[in-house]
Structure formats: C-alpha cells, structure tokens
Amino acid sequence: MELKGKKVLVAGLGVSGIALCKVLDSLKAKVIAYDEKEYDVLKENLEEIKSLSIDFRFGKFKKEFLEGVDLIVLSPGVPIDSDIVKTAQEKKIELLGEVEFAYRFSKAPIYAITGTNGKTTTTSLLGEMFKNTGRKVYVAGNIGYPLIYAVMEAAEDDFIVAEISSFQLETIKEFKPKISCIINITPDHLDRHKTFENYRDIKGRIFENQREDEYTVLNYDDPVTWSLKNKAKCRVFPFSRKSLLENGAYIKDGSIYISVNGNAEKIIDIEEIYIPGEHNLENALAASSVAYLSGISADVIANTLKTFKGVEHRIEFVDEINGVKFYNDSKGTNPDASIKAIQALKTPIVLIAGGYDKGSEFDEFVKAFNGKVKKLILIGQTAKKIRDTARKYSYPEDDILFAGTLEEAVKKAYESAKEGDSVLLSPACASWDMFRNFEERGRIFKKAVAELRR
C-alpha cells in the first residue's frame, strides 16, 4: 500500500491510534490525528507523537476535517455509526479499521483469537506455545501491543498471534487469519452493538474470508459459538470439555486429547496444567487446538501448559495478609467473566464489583454467588443496579456495602474478611467510569492491597 504524500486521517487516539500515527508518519503520509476528546484529556497519550509532523484536531467532529483526505483509519474505539464514519461514507472516502489496515502490510501469517472471555489468556498461551518452538513470534492486537507494530516488524517466516475484539472485527474487509478461533460468546458490549445477535455475528466475521483449506477452531460446548459453524466456508475444528469428539480436542479419562482425521493423540493430564479453573481448561483446549493444527508437537504444547502462569489482571493472586488472599480479576469486564472467577476460587469470597454500565444484566452473576460470596462491596455506575439485582434474589442487604473509590472498597473488603477468605476484585463491568482501562483499575487494586501492609 503506497501512502507517501497521501493525506491520511487517524480517528481515535488511544493506544492503537498513537501506533497508527507513528507508522503512517514513517511511511511519509500526511497525517491528521483526530479525537473527539479535548487535548487536555489526551495530553499524556500524545507525548510520544507530539514531535512528529502531524496535524492534530480535537473536539466535536467537523466536516471540514475531511477536506482532501484520501484515507481514514479508524481506531477500535470509534463506533461505525459515528459522524465521522457517516460523513466519510457520504464523501466516498476510503475507510479502513485498524486491524484491516495492519493486515494489508502483513508478511507473516496471523493466528487470530476472539471470544467474549478468555481471549487474553488464550492468546498469551498460544504465543508461548509458538515461542517454545524456537521461532520468532509476535503477540499483538487487543492485548496491548498494536497489530500495526507487529506486522511492520514480522518477517515472512515469523508468526503473529493476535487477540481480536468485536470492535476490531466490525470494520474488517479482507482480513484473513491462517487459523482463527472463537472461544465463547456471551452478552457483552451491547451499548455499542445494540443486540446480542449483532454481537454474535460480528464475532463470526473472524473466519468470513477463510477458505476450505484453512481452519477455524470453535467451542462445541457453547451453543451460540457452535451455531456459527454453518457460516464457515473453511474447515471447522471443535473443542469440548464435555463431549468426546471424533475430530477435535476433547477430554477423556482426565486428559486432553486431540484427534485430526480420526488419529487421536494424548496431549497432557489435566492435573498437570499449571493455571487452575474450568474456564482455563477451555482456554487450554482452544490454544492447544490452534497450536496442533499449525504443526506444533504435543510435547511442546504439554510443556507450555505445565509452565504457563496466566496473565496479569485475570484471577491474578496478589498477596495474602493475615490469612486473607487477594485476587485481581480486573479483566472481568462482563458478568460471564466474573462468574468464571467466582467459580474458580474455592474459599468464601468478599467480592468487589461494579463499574461502567455497558447495558449488561446481572441476574446470572448474582445467582453464581451461591453461598460463596459472603460480602459484596460495590463501586461505580452499576453499583445500585447490581444491588437491586442482588436484593431481587434475596441476597442479604446487610452484606452489601458501597464504596466511593477502589481504595475504600479494598479497605472495607479487608475489614469484612476473615482468615481463610479471599478478597476478589472481579467487577463484571468495564472500567471507563472511574479508570482509563482495566489495567489501571487492576494496578490501583494491587497498590491498595500493598497499602494494607503499612
């Protein structure tokens, strides 16, 4: 793609947008960087690009921003029904999403993972499996390292393992992974995608350009994910925790097996997998399937599963103070993710929950308390909504506390906990009402836990 001298507007100046600006500048494009937020809010983000020859625009979108623009590259945070997108379509200006734009530069094969929950763990785990073959691998995408950096650096015989979100899949056109994978689909981001059906269909776009000699790996146990198989033009490879499969990855007699064309091979005994929890077994099956189909040996897969310690902010053990264990699950940004965290812990739980309202319902989340959650500390926009749902299911009002800050919530949780209990931050909500992102929320939680020792 020849961009020298072309006028390119980058919409949205988060992590992806900053990366796009840097790469476009290096390609000698004339870059316009736009964000609807004001400069003061973004000042910190813009430090690394303010010295580049970029034309910055901030605040409410104006049609004149698009004057003479040849191409618009959208960051994932910019909705497709926004004014800038509508105006670009009216003016017939080429519009590419960040992932689509990056894909067009890629020389290396991309192995793409999506799903509502488990994406980051599965992507990181698969990345480790590739690394353990001795090959050069880039782990990128929604995981924090922008895909545009990975494709610019990766050579033809390297690998790119990419976590892809629904926001990124919304704008793909030609994007075609070598192998794709959908771990699961449960309601999320309905404030953006409007209906669950629309959200499901966007997730299914991950394999829409793959052909009959390529694979998509789908969760056989999740009816919503499995229903997408009928849309696939490529081969479908299932994984299951519950069923024996003639062709796919499955559990038999306490071990993971993978069968391709009827030839089954044992991979590992489940008890040897380092990271605990049923949800992590699902992640292990998904990553192992993609790795095996790409030619990685059972030995390398097994050794990685024995040593991989999980990812930050996902049921991450933080500390034990006076017999109370603290876990950071800030990545629990929807009810289903937080249900899995509650199920993974085997002790009584003091739960810190609440945050930005994405339009989620909390009935199943509250039902999962099931006698395990002894106290509920609520923060953020959804605090009252979760409280009302908890009361609907007869959760004792005396066991519900409110906190104005996460630091206050940690103190209240510690005061409510006894020796042998766990304090779990698993908000079941996004972080954007109080924090820049879930990583910042997780770091503040860990800092607040450390303060308890002082």
Curated annotation (Swiss-Prot):
GO cellular component: cytoplasm
Pathway the protein contributes to: Cell wall biogenesis; peptidoglycan biosynthesis
Principal place of residence: cytoplasm
Known EC number: 6.3.2.9
Catalysed reaction equations from the record: UDP-N-acetyl-alpha-D-muramoyl-L-alanine + D-glutamate + ATP = UDP-N-acetyl-alpha-D-muramoyl-L-alanyl-D-glutamate + ADP + phosphate + H(+)
Keyword ATP-binding: yes
Gene3D superfamilies: Mur ligase, C-terminal domain, Mur-like, catalytic domain, NAD(P)-binding Rossmann-like Domain
Keywords: ATP-binding, Cell cycle, Cell division, Cell shape, Cell wall biogenesis/degradation, Cytoplasm, Ligase, Nucleotide-binding, Peptidoglycan synthesis
Molecular-function GO term, any one: ATP binding
Binding site for ATP: 115-121
Name used for this protein in its record: UDP-N-acetylmuramoylalanine--D-glutamate ligase
Record localization: Cytoplasm
Family: Belongs to the MurCDEF family.
Task performed by this protein: Cell wall formation. Catalyzes the addition of glutamate to the nucleotide precursor UDP-N-acetylmuramoyl-L-alanine (UMA).
